[in-house]
Regions:
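Basic/polar N-terminal segments that are highly enriched at the extreme N-terminus
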Residues: 1-5
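Glycine-rich phosphate-binding loop
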Residues: 96, 100
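Acetyl-CoA-dependent GNAT
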Residues: 6, 10-94, 106-108, 112, ...
Length: 117
């Protein structure tokens, strides 16, 4: 039996603006706001499209109907083995931190990576 109220689900286009807000809010908390940081990646504004390709998946975490975080997987760019993937753009607003959502999202991403092979 789960002891939390959040829900992990695949991202939809409806979630794109919310995830862009979350990413642009969280990254500066850690000093990650200049050139070369993911905060400036064009895909931040359309995560549902960016992670809709082969061997890609992105999930959002909802709490009481509000998206408070997300994270996903995609093939590792430049890898010689196309089966190698990486965790990408995993961010949570403070209201979701410290409750185990990160662990559950990581497990969800790892399960999807295994499914991809």
């Amino acid at each position: 039996m789960k002891d939390h109220n959040w829900k992990i689900r695949p991202i939809t286009p409806y979630d794109d603006s919310r995830m862009a807000y979350i990413i642009r809010t969280v990254m500066p908390e850690y000093g990650a706001k200049g050139d070369g940081f993911a905060i400036n990646d064009p895909e931040v504004d359309w995560m549902s499209k960016a992670y809709n390709g082969p061997r890609c998946a992105y999930y959002v975490v909802e709490l009481e109907g509000q998206v408070l975080g997300g994270g996903g997987i995609a093939p590792l760019e430049g890898a010689t083995n196309p089966r190698i993937c990486e965790l990408r753009k995993m961010y949570f607003l403070p209201a979701l931190r410290g409750q185990g959502a990160g662990l559950e999202l990581m497990q969800t991403c790892l399960a999807k990576a295994r499914e991809f092979g």
